Amino acid sequence: MSDRDNKKTIDKVLSFLESNKGQYVSGADMAASIGISRNAVWKAINELRSRGYVIESITNKGYMLSEDNDIISAEGIESFIGPKHGHMAEHLLVYDSVDSTNNKAKESALKGACHGTCIIAARQDSGRGRRDHQFYSPEGGIYMSVVLLPDKIPFSKNDAVTAFIGVAVCKAIESLTGLKPVIMGINDLYIDGKKICGILIESGSEFDSGILQWIVAGIGINFDSDIKKFPRELKGNVTSLYPPGKGDMSKNRLIAKILENIDVLAKNSEKDIKKEFTKRRVEK
């Protein structure tokens, strides 16, 4: 089996386990559903375990992907995206670490990436905020950048897009956690007076005509980040949705909800988005 075929097999096994997360599935059923041998299933399971996935196994019951797993994966995100928004899961690129998800997304946009293409990383080595300020991006966070095409959203000015993304993230956090984040200024989300999320919007235009070609929306969320390890100058000003390793939901689920919200809100008018934004905005 080639490396490419092996990767496809592993991805299919992971996708099957994600869609049955928390319950046992037999190796025979998995093999039949995917169209591979039971031996190939066994090899894929071992490879996934070596990557850190907690997969339990019991004789005569099969395999179960533990609910405790919180590894970001395209398969995991896709398992939480509803059928109406399936196209938002067609171009997910997940990395353990990148310099900047916005940089990766811009590279993809310049190569003609589709609307909704999403770059996601567990860590950024050179994360950026507005005015090129450093955005501290350790493990425990969600770092994602979405490519948006102007003909797919009802507005194109950076501030309007920032508001649109801010509302999408707020609504996702509200619906999944019950928390009520507010938008401080225009591009930062706060909970209980401390920053939980930053947003960076960048765009590219055709040189001769100045016509907008693409927009990249960068989102950085402290999910279950260890705030104690943040730089001293940040510790008192930031918070995390959950304590380290104790999230009540998976990162994949929150990412999926944000992508669904982007898809839904893109069909709204700028007036409607502004109304939702204003409800959540507070002055610094």
Model regions and ranges:
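Short loop/edge segments at beta-strand edges and connector loops
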Residues: 96, 183-185
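N-terminal lobe of the biotin/lipoate ligase/transferase fold
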Residues: 2-174, 197
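Long, positively charged amphipathic alpha-helical accessory segments at protein N-termini or as interdomain linkers
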Residues: 2-36, 50, 151-181, 191-284
